[in-house]
């Protein structure tokens, strides 16, 4: 390090290394120097960080109205109109409640009306957009979002995950900013798999069913939970992260296979013998919209768990038209995604209308919903995606109905030969 008494040629900025002659001014500190250029650069960095922090703070107070939330969901999620409306209202009311609680002073809190939290239960078949709806909501609201699988959870003290590990995922999604995590969204999937195995309470302990429901009660309602920072089981010599779940929105979802029979029996819509009314699978799925708490209790959810999920909404099985729309219409439609991938190799990808219909029909036949569309696209395009990057002659790939249904190769259109090559 250069000293003050040395020649000016030896004095250099400790950050960029420029000499005193190369800069306008060199500021001396205790054993270090900084030039005017580095000072200006540091000021720019600080201003950018402050601006980013301001944007984050302002985004936290940007609460869209239900119609705006619905409109955003419309851009990305096809169908499920009733579910989108219910979710838009429920999410708006939840965060309106959060803002109201944050604005109340300690003195006003005594006399103010306390609004209870309204968690959401989503019921519907697999591949119909339950998880995607929740993910899209979180992205619009700019809040931390975590997905958990209820089947991995067990009651405390047994092999498996504790319910507190769900909260750890949310904290990790918020980059360990606990305050931000406390206003996030947790999506718990496969909640129907933790239903009690029998309608009557069992003598033996149901550690992955009723036991998990009991363990979830407190965090659903709102409590200060102790979360192990590295996950896993708690032990006494470990530091814990304290998180308040009062303002965390829980969206729990499941397929609830067999629930339609319970609803139908309760409503008297099932009969036996030759006089029994005929009904289709579509009628069964529409029965979900008539679900009552007593049906969920008979399915295997305990009353206390049902009571903490006051907003119940359903999604319906996607038909061919809806799957066709999912393939082509949303901003991140599956067809557009694959077209973009081919574009990166300089190749244009096209689909015949009949090919898209065949893909949608296959997804309906396999009963995999929207989730199965990508698997079918991979089956159809996999071989050609292997060949295209190695060939410079391919200009266009056209996917036909035969390529989908008969494993035929998609049509390959080569580049047009240049005029010089023609004249030769």
Curated annotation (Swiss-Prot):
* Coiled-coil ranges per UniProt: none
Q: Tell me which SMART domains the record gives.
A: AAA, ClpB_D2-small, zf-C4_ClpX
What Gene Ontology molecular function terms does this protein carry? ATP binding; ATP hydrolysis activity; ATP-dependent protein folding chaperone; protein dimerization activity; unfolded protein binding; zinc ion binding
PROSITE patterns noted in UniProt? CLPX_ZB (PS51902)
Q: Which residues bind Zn(2+)?
A: 13, 16, 35, 38
Give the GO biological process terms: cell division; proteolysis involved in protein catabolic process
Alphabetical UniProt keywords: ATP-binding, Chaperone, Metal-binding, Nucleotide-binding, Zinc
The entry's ATP-binding residues are: 125-132
Q: How does it assemble?
A: Component of the ClpX-ClpP complex. Forms a hexameric ring that, in the presence of ATP, binds to fourteen ClpP subunits assembled into a disk-like structure with a central cavity, resembling the structure of eukaryotic proteasomes.
Spell out the HAMAP family in the cross-references.
Answer: ClpX
PANTHER family, per database record: ATP-DEPENDENT CLP PROTEASE ATP-BINDING SUBUNIT CLPX-LIKE, MITOCHONDRIAL, ATP-DEPENDENT CLP PROTEASE ATP-BINDING SUBUNIT CLPX-LIKE, MITOCHONDRIAL-RELATED
Q: Which family does it belong to?
A: Belongs to the ClpX chaperone family.
**What is the annotated role of this protein in its UniProt record?**
ATP-dependent specificity component of the Clp protease. It directs the protease to specific substrates. Can perform chaperone functions in the absence of ClpP.
* Name assigned to this protein: ATP-dependent Clp protease ATP-binding subunit ClpX
**Source species:** Leifsonia xyli subsp. xyli (strain CTCB07)
Organism lineage: Bacteria, Bacillati, Actinomycetota, Actinomycetes, Micrococcales
Q: What gene is this protein translated from? A: clpX
